[in-house]
Amino acid sequence: MKKIFQFIGLFVLICFSFFYTEKAITVLNEQDPIMVEIENKKDYYYLKPIDATIKYNTIIPGIRGKEVNINKTYDNMKKIGFFNEKNIIYDDIKPSISLCDNYDKYIIRGNSIKNGIALLFIIKEDKYLDNLIKIAKDKDITVNLFITTDYLNNNISKLYKFTNTEIYNFAREGIYQKDLIILGNNIINRNAKNRSSYCLTKEMFTDTLNICSKNKMHTIYPSKIINSNFYSNIKSDITKGDIILLELTNNMLEELNTIIDFIKKKGINIIGLNELLNE
């Protein structure tokens, strides 16, 4: 019995020793000039998150905020011996209203803070595809290809060659069913550089929204759908955050270089959906 009490006493002593040591280290850290400066400046580097905008059955993504991770930043700066803002380590702050929690809404545009737009194209055959990819590469932009599952299934070996693109599932020409979603997504996720995260609809079909939502995919309803007079339509009305679906035709390709140059001159980036819609 005596040995048991001795063991318990030793255990309590060790626990107290650890607690006291940790407390002492915490006090010393709090008095360190580096820690003091981090505490004093953390509010300056705080970035408030912006909530997604929901109106009826539509959504515009928000923007994540960030805050200084005090302990990780302190450990990082302690290695160099002084405060340096380049060594600050941040934690993301998810918006209270977030795209990630709302699969049952149509994404109608990106957040204008991103200073970008997305160009979308539907692909169901090879026609014009090589020319489109060449223009995207030459102009150093990213285009978003919504590809039918038939084309995906018959052209798997080509996908890795699609530079300057993001690839998404267009199922059976926009008709989404569970088996087509699984097939198309598996092909894309295994062979493309991006994950298959989005469905595309030209009209607000509840069936599309429901089945894509059940499969944890967001549904995009473009800000603009342009089938003719491509340059004129874009020139007359373009804003940051636009998601523009362009019909892939010979006339469109003839105007695409001019369209890209016009958008760039306005200081707007032409980017992938992943970047435009990521909070």
Question: Residue ranges of each PLM-predicted region?
Answer:
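Terminal accessory/targeting
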Residues: 1-119, 134-143, 239-279
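Metal-dependent polysaccharide deacetylase catalytic core of the NodB/CE4 family, i.e.
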Residues: 117, 126-231, 240-243
